[in-house]
C-alpha cells in the first residue's frame, strides 16, 4: 500500500491464532442483547422445563415408590434403586461437565431423559440382570440431566434478574421453587396412576387383607420393621402381572412425552449466553481438565460444609420412598394404599415448594430452613415411637404431608444456596450437589435390607444434626463476607467522592457508582454473564 518493502521480513509469516481463539476480555466478547419483553419468554422456558420434569417423574417416582413393595423378593427393588444412585455418584464425577459442553444444555436434557425408559420397561420382567443394569443406565443419565436443569434455571434466572432489576438470589430461589412445585406434583400424578390401577384390579381386594391384618403382624410394622423378617406378611405380596403391565405402559408413555416437550418447545440456552460465562478458554480445556472441575469445586469450604445436609436430602428422600412406604404404609394398610398416602406427600411438597420460593424474599432463607429442620427432627422422633394401625389412616397421610413440608424446604433452599454461592462454576457446583445427594440415597439403600427401621431413624437424626451445624457455619461466613464487601464498597465510594469533590454533583455520583465496581469478584458475587447481557429499554 505504501510502496515500501522491508526485505528483512520478506520470508516471515505471521503466527496465526488457533482456531476458535478469542481474547479473554469481557469487552471483546459478543454481547447478548435482549429487550424487557424477553422476560415472558424466559418464564415460558421455565414452565416448559418444569412441565417436562413433572411428566418424566410422574413415571419414575411412581415406579420408585413401589420398588420396595412390589419387588420385595431378595430385596430386588431396593437393590435396583441402590444401583441407580451408585451410578449417579460416578456419573456426577465424570459426566455432566463433559456432556453439557459437547451436547449443550438442551440436548443433554433430551438424551438423559431417554435413559429412564429401559428401567420402566423392565418392570415387566424384574430380574437382577434386567433391573440392575437398567438402573445403572438411569443413574448415568440422571447426573447430566439434573446438572443441565440447574444450569438452565440459574443462568436464565440471572438474565431475568437483570432485565427486571431484581435481586439475583431471590429470582433463582423463586425459579427453583416453581420448578419443584411442578416436579413434586409428579408424586401426585405418578402415585394416583398406580393407586387407581392397583385398587381397580384384582389386587384392589388387598384392602380386605389390611382390615383383617393380625395384631402379630402389626407388631412388626413401623420402627420395629425389619426387611429380613417380613416374609409371609399378607400385605406385602406382589400385585398381579396385568396390573404391573398397565402401569408400566402408562409410565413409558410419560417418558416419551417428556422428551418431546424438551426437544420441540425449550429454547436453547445459547439464547441467554451459554458458553459466555467467561472466555472461551473453558472450551479449549482437555477432557481431563473438564473432569477435574467437579473435584476442584469440592475444595471450596462452603461446599464442604454443605455436604452433610446434601447427603441428608438424599437419605430422607430414600426413607420416605422406600422405608416409610414399606415399613409403615404397606405393612399396615397394604400395597394398594402406598400411592394414595404418597399423593399427600407430593401435593404438600409441591405447594410448599412454590410457597417457600415466594416468601423467601420477605423473610429470608434462614427462617425457612429452621422450619424444615424442626419438622424433620419432630417427625423422625415421632416415628421412633409411633406404632402404625390401619384403624387410624389419617395419621399416615399427616406424616406423609409433613415430610413433604420438610423436603420442600431442603429442595428449594439448598438448591438455591448452591446457585447463589457458586455462580461462576454452576455445572461443577450442581454436579457436586447431585453427587452428595446421590451418596445419601446410596447409603440409605445400602443398609435398607440389613438394618431395621429404628436404626435407620437414628442415623437420619445424626446426619440431620451434622447438616444443620454445617449450614449454620455457611450462613455465618456468607453474612460476614457480605458485610465486608458492603463496607469495602462504601470505602471505595467515599474515596471516589473525595477525589471528585471539585466536579459537578452528577459526575461525583457517577464516580461513586464506578467505585462500587472495584470489588473483587468471588464465587458468591457477580458472574461474568452479567457483563455480557445488554438490556435495551425502548
Swiss-Prot record:
Keywords: Glycoprotein, Membrane, Transmembrane, Transmembrane helix. Gene3D superfamilies: MFS general substrate transporter like domains (1.20.1250.20). The keyword Transmembrane applies. Signal peptide: none annotated. It is found in: Membrane. Pfam families: UNC-93 (PF05978). It is a multi-pass membrane protein. InterPro entries: Ion_channel_UNC-93, MFS_trans_sf, UNC-93_regulatory. GO terms for biological process: inorganic ion homeostasis; regulation of muscle contraction; regulation of potassium ion transport; renal system process; transmembrane transport. Glycans are attached at residues 45, 210. CDD domains: MFS_unc93A_like. Its main location: membrane. GO terms for molecular function: potassium channel regulator activity; transmembrane transporter activity. One of its GO terms (cellular component) is plasma membrane. The keyword Transmembrane applies. The chain crosses the membrane at residues 46-66, 80-100, 105-125, 128-148, 170-190, 244-264, 305-325, 338-358, 366-386, 394-414, 435-455, 457-477. Belongs to the unc-93 family. This is UNC93-like protein. It comes from Drosophila melanogaster (Fruit fly).
Amino acid at each position: 500500500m505504501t510502496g515500501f518493502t522491508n526485505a528483512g521480513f520478506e520470508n516471515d509469516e505471521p503466527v496465526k491464532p488457533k482456531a476458535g481463539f478469542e481474547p479473554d476480555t469481557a469487552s471483546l466478547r459478543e454481547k447478548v442483547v435482549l429487550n424487557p419483553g424477553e422476560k415472558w419468554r424466559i418464564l415460558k422456558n421455565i414452565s416448559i422445563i418444569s412441565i417436562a420434569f413433572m411428566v418424566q417423574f410422574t413415571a419414575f417416582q411412581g415406579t420408585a415408590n413401589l420398588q420396595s413393595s412390589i419387588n420385595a423378593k431378595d430385596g430386588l427393588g431396593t437393590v435396583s434403586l441402590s444401583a441407580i444412585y451408585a451410578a449417579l455418584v460416578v456419573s456426577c464425577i465424570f459426566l455432566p461437565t463433559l456432556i453439557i459442553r459437547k451436547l449443550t444444555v438442551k440436548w443433554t436434557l433430551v438424551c438423559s431423559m431417554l435413559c429412564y425408559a429401559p428401567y420402566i420397561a423392565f418392570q415387566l420382567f424384574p430380574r437382577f440382570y434386567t433391573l440392575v443394569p437398567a438402573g445403572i443406565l438411569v443413574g448415568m443419565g440422571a447426573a447430566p440431566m439434573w446438572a443441565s436443569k440447574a444450569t438452565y434455571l440459574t443462568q436464565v434466572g440471572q438474565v431475568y434478574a437483570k432485565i427486571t432489576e431484581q435481586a439475583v438470589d431471590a429470582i433463582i430461589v423463586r425459579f427453583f421453587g416453581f420448578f419443584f412445585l411442578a416436579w413434586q406434583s409428579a408424586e401426585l400424578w405418578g402415585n394416583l396412576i398406580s393407586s387407581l390401577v392397583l385398587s381397580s384390579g384384582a389386587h384392589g381386594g388387598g384392602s380386605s387383607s389390611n382390615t383383617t391384618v393380625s395384631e402379630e403382624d402389626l407388631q412388626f410394622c413401623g420402627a420395629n420393621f425389619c426387611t429380613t423378617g417380613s416374609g409371609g406378611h399378607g400385605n406385602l405380596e406382589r400385585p398381579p402381572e396385568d396390573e404391573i403391565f398397565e402401569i408400566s405402559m402408562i409410565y413409558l408413555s410419560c417418558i416419551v412425552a417428556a422428551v418431546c416437550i424438551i426437544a420441540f418447545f425449550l429454547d436453547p440456552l445459547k439464547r441467554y449466553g451459554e458458553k459466555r460465562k467467561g472466555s472461551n478458554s473453558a472450551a479449549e480445556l482437555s477432557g481431563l481438565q473438564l473432569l477435574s472441575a467437579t473435584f476442584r469445586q469440592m475444595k471450596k469450604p462452603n461446599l464442604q460444609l454443605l455436604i452433610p445436609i446434601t447427603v441428608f436430602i438424599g437419605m430422607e428422600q430414600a426413607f420416605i420412598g422406600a422405608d416409610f412406604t414399606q415399613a409403615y404404609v404397606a405393612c399396615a394398610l397394604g400395597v394398594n394404599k402406598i400411592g394414595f398416602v404418597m399423593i399427600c406427600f407430593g401435593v404438600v411438597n409441591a405447594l410448599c415448594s412454590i410457597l417457600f420460593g415466594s416468601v423467601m424474599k420477605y423473610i429470608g432463607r434462614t427462617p425457612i430452613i429452621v422450619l424444615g429442620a424442626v419438622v424433620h427432627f419432630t417427625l423422625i422422633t415421632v416415628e421412633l415411637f409411633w406404632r402404625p394401625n390401619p384403624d387410624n389412616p389419617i395419621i399416615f397421610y399427616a406424616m406423609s404431608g409433613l415430610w413433604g413440608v420438610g423436603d420442600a424446604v431442603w429442595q428449594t433452599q439448598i438448591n438455591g444456596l448452591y446457585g447463589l454461592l457458586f455462580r461462576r462454576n454452576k455445572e461443577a457446583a450442581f454436579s457436586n450437589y447431585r453427587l452428595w445427594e446421590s451418596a445419601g440415597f446410596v447409603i440409605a439403600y445400602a443398609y435398607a435390607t440389613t438394618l431395621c427401621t429404628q436404626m435407620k431413624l437414628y442415623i437420619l437424626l445424626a446426619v440431620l444434626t451434622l447438616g444443620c451445624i454445617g449450614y449454620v457455619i455457611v450462613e455465618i461466613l456468607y453474612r460476614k463476607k457480605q458485610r465486608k464487601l458492603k463496607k469495602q464498597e462504601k470505602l471505595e465510594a467515599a474515596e471516589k467522592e473525595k477525589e471528585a469533590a471539585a466536579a459537578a454533583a452528577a459526575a461525583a455520583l457517577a464516580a461513586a457508582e464506578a467505585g462500587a465496581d472495584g470489588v473483587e469478584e468471588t464465587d458468591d458475587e457477580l458472574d461474568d454473564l452479567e457483563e455480557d447481557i445488554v438490556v435495551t429499554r425502548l
